[in-house]
Design a protein with these regions (language model features):
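Active-site phosphate-binding/coordination module
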Residues: 1-61, 155
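Short amphipathic alpha-helical segments
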Residues: 3-7, 27-28, 83, 145-146, ...
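Conserved beta-strand termini and adjacent loop/short-helix elements that scaffold enzyme active sites
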Residues: 17, 99-101, 175
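Conserved acidic, metal-coordinating active-site core of Asp-based
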Residues: 45-146
Length: 203
């Protein structure tokens, strides 16, 4: 729905699936060689889903999952299963990511938003000072840990706020969503103070 919204500029590149998929924004075709590098270490959605089948307490998310397997799971349910799930994923050569006390992702090894964004920046020869990352849940943590200048928008997951508290390049906004990003643009001085794009319109 967002990509078809004429009011939203279409991105040149899209990193999605928690970093497991990277495509051209206008054609939605895989961006090579980055995508092939990720795919080479992914055993396949069906293989991973079958390995996770014994964990009946996990509820599969109804989203496209070509390069990840994603589930819903609350903390109390996950606690006694976590070690077994991590062992099963490790046997497949996969990583486990849990965020927002709800989202459980089985991912290709060494794959996350931060690593994929860093690889994309190198491919495009983009200097880090031209990059601003934003997020609100723990699955965004890797972008901040990768050293990019970033903002945790208002109402972020407490675990993300805590994990980024000591990161020099990360700023914590008070406004949620896009408002927090605008605050960060102003904080980091990415636009001139009188730029009309800097201030959100008031109702």
């Amino acid at each position: 729905p967002l990509l078809s919204d004429p009011a939203i500029p279409r991105p040149d590149y899209i990193v999605c699936d928690v970093g497991a998929t990277v495509v051209h924004g206008h054609t939605l075709q895989p961006l090579q060689p980055l995508q092939s590098m990720i795919d080479a270490h992914w055993p396949g959605e069906q293989v991973v889903a079958e390995a996770m089948r014994p964990f009946t307490a996990l509820q599969r998310q109804d989203v496209p999952q070509e390069r990840r397997c994603s589930y819903f799971c609350d903390p109390a349910t996950l606690a006694p299963l976590r070690a077994q799930i991590q062992q099963t994923a490790a046997e497949l050569g996969c990583d486990v990511l849990y965020s927002a006390d709800r989202y459980l992702d089985i991912l290709p090894p060494d794959t996350d938003k931060g690593r994929t964004l860093a690889a994309l920046a190198r491919l495009l020869e983009l200097p880090r000072e031209r990059i601003l990352v934003a997020g609100d849940t723990l699955n965004d943590l890797s972008m901040y840990q990768a050293g990019f200048r970033g903002v945790c928008v208002g109402e972020s997951e407490p675990a993300l706020v805590e994990a980024t508290a000591g990161l020099e390049c990360t700023w914590h906004a008070t406004a949620p969503g896009c408002g927090g990003i605008l605050q960060a643009i102003e904080h980091f001085g990415l636009l001139a103070a009188d730029d009309p794009h800097l201030h959100a319109p008031t109702a």
